[in-house]
Amino acid sequence: MDDDGSLSIRNWGFYETMKGNLGLQLMPSVTGGHRDTKPLLPNGTFLQHHTPPHHPPHSHHPRDYGNGEPSGGMPAEPPAIHMDFVRNEAWMHPSQHQHQHQHQHQHQHQHQHQLQHQHQHQHSRELKVLNAVPVGPAPHIGHPGHAVHHHPTGFGMMPDARGAHTLQMMQPQEPPVPDEEKITPPLVEDHSVVGSKPPVKKRQQGRQPKVPKPKKPKKDATPGEDGAPKARAPRSRGPLKPVEMVINGIDFDISRIPTPVCSCTGAPQQCYRWGAGGWQSACCTTSISTYPLPMNTKRRGARIAGRKMSQGAFKKVLEKLAGEGYNLNNPIDLKTFWAKHGTNKFVTIR
């Protein structure tokens, strides 16, 4: 390895120039007549040559030749070009590169100045447009139906903007109303009363209102001599209906028979009527015999029910006594004729 780190290789880090240009003319020389032509791109990046600050634009190796031969008199080696020139077009035309680079830099500066002037002019035009009358939906300005013909160029587009900062002064237009919404439905009266109840007035006309019956006034109790109302008299029972019964072939009315008695306590006690033609004891049950019978603990205001006898059983008693020649005009003692099966618990004796 050498002192400069070139690994003893000739032209380390350099490319040898090609012998001749092989008849290629990739870039025409820039003459005075082409100074006003514009570069291929607006900013001229295609022709611009960026050179690092630590490499001069035309730096050659120390072994470059002068006057065709080096100082040693030996045949000159082909000139070597630094690798930075591979990235640009300097290796094609080394004699014109410096002049072309200066012309490009001058033309680029002129183009930037022109763009800045154009931007200022466009900004002033935008301010004028903003201060102008607002533009309605094209082509109508102001009143609808009146087209303005003295403005051939509208404020919507700037023809001289050259693709930058186009200003559109279009107001947001409302979306068009569909035809279905424009057609208003015809006014139709609502006759959907099918199945509903008729009005109250019609029902009142069909039916006559019921007249409430007048309530009978309550009779006030006639005051007595002292001014106090008289006490209600006990309700008297009506006459007994005749009950015809055939006893031993003789029609007999049992309603005329005197009330039977029970002498289980030693003193005869009248029995109570029970059911249809039956009788009930007022002093005895199957277990006790006392008068009056004790009060029922389960039913308030009622006593224990005594033994009972149905109408059929009483008829049998009458047939038996009539066969023995008993005078039925005398009260009958039912002490020995009560049923043996007990008493009815639900009979109330008052």
UniProtKB/Swiss-Prot annotation:
Compositional bias of type Basic and acidic residues: which residue ranges? 179-192
Record GO cellular component, one term: nucleus
| Expression across tissues | Ubiquitously expressed.
Major location, coarse class?
Answer: nucleus
Pfam families xref list = GAGA_bind
* Segments of this protein annotated with the region Disordered: 43-74, 93-125, 137-241
Q: Does this entry carry the keyword Metal-binding?
A: no
Q: Where in the cell is it found?
A: Nucleus
Q: Which GO terms describe its biological process?
A: regulation of DNA-templated transcription; response to ethylene
Keywords assigned by UniProt, alphabetized: DNA-binding, Nucleus, Transcription, Transcription regulation
Query: Compositional bias of type Basic residues: which residue ranges?
Result: 51-61, 96-122, 199-218
Indicate which residues form the motif Bipartite nuclear localization signal: 199-219
GO molecular-function term, one example from the UniProt record = sequence-specific DNA binding
Entry keyword annotation includes Transmembrane = no
What is the recorded function of this protein according to its Swiss-Prot or TrEMBL entry?
Transcriptional regulator that specifically binds to GA-rich elements (GAGA-repeats) present in regulatory sequences of genes involved in developmental processes. Positively regulates the homeotic gene BKN3.
Family membership, please give it. Belongs to the BBR/BPC family.
Protein name in the entry: Protein Barley B recombinant
Origin species: Hordeum vulgare (Barley)
* Encoding gene (name): BBR
